[in-house]
Amino acid sequence: MKNILSLILLLLSVSVFGQKIPVMQKKSTGKEIHIDVYSAFQKKAPMLKASQFVEDIEFVPLETTDDCILDEFINKIVVTKDYIFAHDYNSCYRFDRKGKFLNKIGAKGNGPGEYTKAMSISIDTINKWVYMSDNWQHKLVKYDYSGKHLGDIKHKISDARNIYLYKPSQLLVESMFYHFAKKGERFCFNFYSEKENRVLSRMSCDYPLIPKKMVSVAPIAYNYKGDLRVKDFWCDTIYRVVDPYHLESHVIIDRGKFERYKTDNKALTTGKLDPRHRMVLGISRIEETDRYILMVSRQGGIVHDKKTGTTHTGGINDNRSCVMEDLYGSPGIRSDHFPSCVQGNEYYTFRHAYEFMEEGNGKHTVTDARYDAFRKMVKGLKADDNPVFMIVKLKK
């Protein structure tokens, strides 16, 4: 009798709590953009030059105050019509588009409205909400633009890190350790509904030969024209999110003889290239504009021109820069922040104030009043000032 009762309870729990979460269906459109990165890297330049794809750059020093001192590494920049949001793992800082500091959002701690560590942010521009992902406590912490705490959203995604807004109250949540799961149970993204407080669907990882020696792997998501684009860490296809249940192929990356990672990329911590990864492609960031698809990889930076069908590549220098800024001669674009945030035909990044002072007068092609304004800006910087925000205006 005891065994029968246990079986009934088990069946009830499966029917109530064990309902299968749908897997997002992938569809091939036959209209994919093909990017032959292997052939492009056979003609790799020492570094990409900004003048190859950049029209102009606007430099905006972010205001430094006693309440606003950003950390050395800015994890994420989000730009809206009126504001700049900068997230440095400790907090989120809101500036106006001219760099004036407005307010801080969020605080570390264990109390109400606090987080242990905010791994990522996502901005809802319609409702003016800010989400922070605290994967230590398995929750999203929600604020308004002024920093007022609006509530905590508990979830059961144990390895959640980066979050991406799909539509108001619908978020795509990245998984960091899905490669440790069994074959057929590896899901790199979870589509989460705040209103329903549940995962609506999941994106599967179909690559069969995943090594478990790696600590974590990170899938990629970015927004283009209001649509999310996603790429699994191991897959060479970028998909467009049609709805929470369907994906359409958008870009196919032809890796040629380039390999996939078999062990962790220790260069991220040591700063030295691992000889075992000499032939690893390892794409870590992707963004897209009307004309360009921008990527950075273990091999260097990639700029694919959708208009001409050409692909330019360049290496990464000792200062971790992958794009030489030859318009104004500024410190260049960091490989760990290229590309990071794109809106329309603008790409947003930053360099620290002290880097502008250390760089001196670099080679530049802009010689008019814009360059004079740039030099005046540099002379007004102090070494311990907050970073300089860069609005990179791409060619159309």
Protein language model annotation of sequence segments:
Residues 250-275, 308-344, 357:
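Conserved blade-ending motifs and adjacent loop-strand segments that build the rim/top face
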